[in-house]
Structure formats: C-alpha cells, structure tokens
C-alpha cells in the first residue's frame, strides 16, 4: 500500500511521536555523558586517594574506552537484528549499575575492570540510538535531530563538572558515582515503555507522520534488517568517515577529559572555580552544535567545506589556549574553540545520517563510532604520557590535539559526498 496516497491526512499535531522518542534518546545520551565525564573531575582525587600518577589515571579513562569501543560494532549489529528499543534499554540499565559500582572501588585493578564493564554498557547504546533517529525522522529533519542529540556532547561535560565538583566538595568522589547510577534505571524503563522499533507500531504515531516517513523510507520505517555485514563493509565512505571521526575524537576526548585537570594544575584554579570555568566552553559548544545542525540541513552542499573550515578555526584557538599567559583569556579561547569544534561535529553527523541507509544505520554508525572510541583509548594515555614526560607541561598535549584535528580536516577533503537512498533492500 502507498501510504502517501492511501491514508487520509488529519490535522498535523504540534507534538509528534518522534519528538517524544528524541527526548528520551536525548536524556539517555545526557546521562551517558554525565556518567562518563564526572570521571574527568574526579580523576585528580581518585589519583590522590589511590596513589596514581597521570599515566595510571589515563589508564582508567582507557579502560572505559576499550569496553566502549569493543561494543560499538556488536551493539550496532544487535540493534539491526533485534531492534533499537531492546538494546538501548538493556545498555542503559547495565552501565547505570557499573556507574554505582565505580564509587565502591578502592584499588586500581578493580577500577579498571569496573570501568571496562561500564564501557560495554555504554558501547551498546550509540548505534541503537542513531538507528532509531534515522528510522523516526525524515531526511529533511535528521541534521537538526542529530544536532539536538549531540548537544549532550557539550552539556554533559558542562553539567558533569558542576555536579562532580559539588558532590566531591561535600561528600567525596565515591558518592558522585553511587548517586549517578540511579537515574539510568528510570530512563531505561522510559525507553522500553515509550518507544517502538517500527514507527508504525508506536501508539502515538499519526498518519501524517507515516506519510512523511514514506516519502523517503522505502521500507516504511522497518526497524530490523538482514543485510549481510560484508555488504555494509563494502561502502568506501564508511571507512573515510570512521577515519575522520577517529582523528576528530582524539581532539574531542583530549579536550573533554583533561580540561578540568589543566585548569586545576596549570592555571591554578580552585575546585569551585574549575566547576564553573570548565563548564563554560561546553555551553559554547552546545550553541555551536545547534547552529551546526541548522546549517547542516540548510546548507547540505557546503557541509564538507564548513567542516574543514570550522575544524581549522577550532585548531587555531586551541593553540591560543595554551600559548596565552592570561588564565582568563585561556578560558575565552577554549570557548571559541569549542564553538567551532562542535559546529564541525554537527556537520559530520549530518553527512553520515544522509549518506548511510537507515536499515543498516546500526552497524554502519557502530563502525564509524568504533573509530571514535579507539581514539578515546589512545587519547587519554598518550596525553597523560605527554604531560608526564614534559614535567607537567600541557603544551605537547595541546599540539597533539591540534595536529589530529587538522588531519581530520585534510581527510575530509578526500570524501566524495553523495546522497544515498534511505534504505538498502533486505535479502529474501
């Protein structure tokens, strides 16, 4: 049946079912960043409590990323096979349990194990969430939808430094993790109760919503796929995007993970001041993400050019951050760098959402995000080693982040952007 011609259209609803789905996904993403990024503020105190040097502290970050990266592709495969709803709900509940367990750890080996399993739970989630966004949103809205979802990349770290600094100051670092494990159980229940893998099965979906999806969804929003994994791997753009995301995320995770420590140890900010100053750049980043998402939908042909341009500008302001003598000006330059860096990030995901068919989005985005999380595995210990080998100076760490961001722009120049059909046909 052709939905576009066979279904009578009623008056469009102001609040659509896909907005509820996006809200739940946004809350889950916010919690995922909050749960992982409080470690950035807690790390100096964990290091002091457990007698760890900066290299060992970097290993704690890497333990999470190893588990997180390891389950990017399996998480996408599971989402394509069993549907996003089940994988998201299980993943959120899993990582929430291990968030609370982090607060009970008293030794480095056990900390590494707990953070690894925490990473596994979070690793199942991204691909499933992107698959659901691509299933529920027509192509004309995906840039803005992913930009809204991506605001957590900035709001999460910003909120994390405020929450962590407040709780650590009052109760110590253990309590931060114990408390933050609780909300995820409620969000997991919300995902299970108020989302469906196939939009047609959602109780709040309207005929108008289905018509909008039918206009560019050849499978009508099918939530599952039996496309062979080897066929997914044959897409050249997939590997180019994974490479770009790997290079970008080395800078992103270095910026996000080490910023609080940099302000405390180099700029000599107090814990309270760090809680405020470390949050401000991420608020600018949220603005950059939303602006980038809007421009991504409005300026599709210029996406590649805009990614390259804003990445180069962000790299320039990163250089000014560590080279300026004024601590307050360093924060200003961090804010400008974050604005352009996250604008570029929105461009990246707009390109991916529009070039990858929705019925293989789970596996495809898992492959791309695997590249990004391998960057997280590498970024934290390498930056920790650079700091330690430079007698506490962060200059070489900043140069490393600048170089990888510029390399991501260079690789982007090689990408041939093309708009694919929204789905690949399932095998009989």
Question: In which residue ranges do the predicted regions lie?
Answer:
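Conserved MFS/SLC helix-loop-helix module at the cytosolic interface between two early adjacent transmembrane helices
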Residues: 70-109
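Cytoplasmic helix-loop-helix junction between adjacent transmembrane helices
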Residues: 114-154
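Helix-loop-helix hairpin linking two adjacent transmembrane segments in secondary transporters
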Residues: 149-200
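C-terminal transmembrane helical hairpin of 12-TM major facilitator-type secondary transporters
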Residues: 302-348
